[in-house]
């Protein structure tokens, strides 16, 4: 019986993986331009980190985490998101003792036991940034502007940036009371999860996707109407900075991110072309998270982008990305006598930084040339016994169909010039 991949996962194969690599390289480039340094955290952490950091009333903790007990009896969880691990790394490695703010970015797989569908998987990939150590509203605006800049460089269109403020520990009690007063008469109609969250965090009810809960919550109080003076001032400054940067936005008074650690600014980017899973990224400020995870009071802000969602949006908008590229050179041989010379040339090409390959199935010369075309080789170098005696090889431009005789001792330089000229054009 054939073993298949687990449900909710994907194999990223040649032809597709180049698109992923391109997006990741563009993300790394923009992160460097904005002053961020890369961080790589373990794909699994102690479960306690997510219980404390993500919030025990969230869907992630209650229903979606991959948690197991290891052979040492420790509870371990595959990371469902990377903000809490970044906080743990910030504290454990004493990054708070160095120059502030600390600006980090990451790229990697996350894991959630979710219902697989278009744009949603159990192993999915995120690109994200975190900034620790600054209360400045300009940082909130920067991460949003950076996200929109990145999408723009990929060519994505029809995007909407939704922003909101979800308050802070000073103004949250007022919001909590108003929400509880509003939802209390409807408590029996709420779903089981929302009823369990009612006392501890009624704000999470606004994020529920159940139709009945969404209908009941349609007229619920807005967080933005309960903001303290400090939060209101912070939000106004965020908006002014976005306007200064010419970043279009919509204030979405209903926006509540699905994680408990957010304070002040929350935002989400949506694409109109990808159906139900329209969100392609989001984030916000989390000024209390570092403290919750055992560190000193430290402000933070960040965002994460879903790589699969980005690819889906690009596809829906008909935006092409670099696909599979074959070797720049394929060595086709005629006769066993030329094999030693061909093998040596193959490795000289590779040492010169030219991607090259050859036949390993003892095909005929005609079959080798057909194979070179199928794998997308740019040039074929044909080495036959008669050419070798004359100290030459034949170089064929596979796209143009043109063929030239080239001295064997000059073929490396010839190909280098051809390939360089092609790349520049």
From Swiss-Prot:
Subcellular location: Cytoplasm
InterPro entries reported for this sequence: aa-tRNA-synth_II, aa-tRNA-synth_II/BPL/LPL, Anticodon-bd, Anticodon-bd_dom_sf, His-tRNA-ligase, HisRS-like_core, HisRS/HisZ, HisRS_anticodon
GO cellular component, one term: cytoplasm
This enzyme's EC code(s): 6.1.1.21
EC class: ligase
One annotated GO biological process: histidyl-tRNA aminoacylation
Keyword terms: Aminoacyl-tRNA synthetase, ATP-binding, Cytoplasm, Ligase, Nucleotide-binding, Protein biosynthesis
Nucleotide-binding listed as a keyword: yes
Major place of residence: cytoplasm
Coiled coil: none
Pfam families: HGTP_anticodon, tRNA-synt_His
GO molecular function: ATP binding; catalytic activity, acting on a protein; histidine-tRNA ligase activity; transferase activity
Catalytic activity: tRNA(His) + L-histidine + ATP = L-histidyl-tRNA(His) + AMP + diphosphate + H(+)
Gene3D superfamilies on file: Anticodon-binding domain (3.40.50.800), Bira Bifunctional Protein, Domain 2 (3.30.930.10)
HAMAP family: His_tRNA_synth
Family per record: Belongs to the class-II aminoacyl-tRNA synthetase family.
NCBIfam families assigned: hisS
Self-association and partners: Homodimer.
Protein name per Swiss-Prot or TrEMBL: Histidine--tRNA ligase
């Amino acid at each position: 019986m054939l073993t298949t991949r687990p449900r909710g996962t994907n194999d990223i194969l040649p032809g597709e993986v180049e698109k992923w690599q391109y997006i990741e390289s563009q993300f790394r480039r923009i992160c460097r331009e904005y002053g961020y340094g890369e961080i790589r955290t373990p794909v699994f952490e102690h479960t306690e980190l997510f219980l404390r950091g993500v919030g025990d009333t969230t869907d992630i903790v209650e229903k979606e985490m991959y948690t197991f007990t290891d052979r040492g009896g420790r509870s371990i969880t595959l990371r469902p998101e990377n903000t809490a691990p970044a906080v743990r790394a910030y504290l454990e490695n004493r990054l708070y003792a160095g120059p502030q703010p600390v600006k980090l970015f990451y790229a990697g797989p996350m894991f959630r036991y979710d219902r697989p569908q278009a744009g949603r998987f159990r192993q999915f990939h995120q690109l994200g940034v975190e900034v620790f150590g600054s209360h400045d509203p300009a940082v909130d605006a920067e991460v949003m502007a950076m996200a929109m800049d990145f999408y723009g460089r990929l060519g994505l269109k029809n995007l909407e940036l939704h922003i909101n403020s979800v308050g802070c520990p000073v103004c949250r009690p007022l919001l909590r009371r108003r929400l509880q007063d509003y939802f209390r008469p409807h408590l029996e109609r709420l779903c089981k999860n929302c009823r369990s969250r009612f006392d501890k965090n009624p704000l999470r009810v606004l994020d529920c996707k159940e139709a009945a809960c969404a209908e009941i919550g349609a007229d619920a109080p807005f967080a933005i109407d309960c903001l303290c003076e400090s939060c209101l001032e912070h939000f106004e400054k965020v908006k002014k900075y976005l306007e200064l940067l010419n970043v279009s936005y919509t204030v979405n008074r209903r926006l509540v991110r699905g994680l408990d650690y957010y304070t002040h600014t929350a935002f989400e980017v949506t694409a109109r072309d990808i159906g139900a899973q329209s969100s392609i990224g989001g984030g916000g400020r989390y000024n209390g998270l570092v403290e919750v995870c055992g560190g000193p009071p430290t402000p933070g802000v960040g965002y994460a982008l879903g790589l699969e969602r980005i690819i889906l949006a690009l596809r829906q908008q008909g935006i092409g990305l670099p696909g599979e590229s074959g070797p720049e050179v394929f060595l086709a041989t005629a006769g066993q006598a030329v094999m030693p010379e061909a093998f040596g040339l193959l490795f000289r090409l590779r040492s010169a930084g030219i991607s090259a390959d050859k036949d390993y199935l003892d095909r005929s010369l005609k079959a080798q040339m057909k194979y070179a075309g199928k794998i997308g080789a740019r040039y074929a170098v044909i080495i036959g016994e008669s050419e070798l005696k004359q100290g030459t090889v034949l170089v064929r431009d596979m796209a143009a169909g043109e063929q030239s005789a080239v001295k064997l001792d000059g073929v490396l330089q010839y190909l280098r010039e051809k390939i360089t000229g092609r790349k520049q054009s």
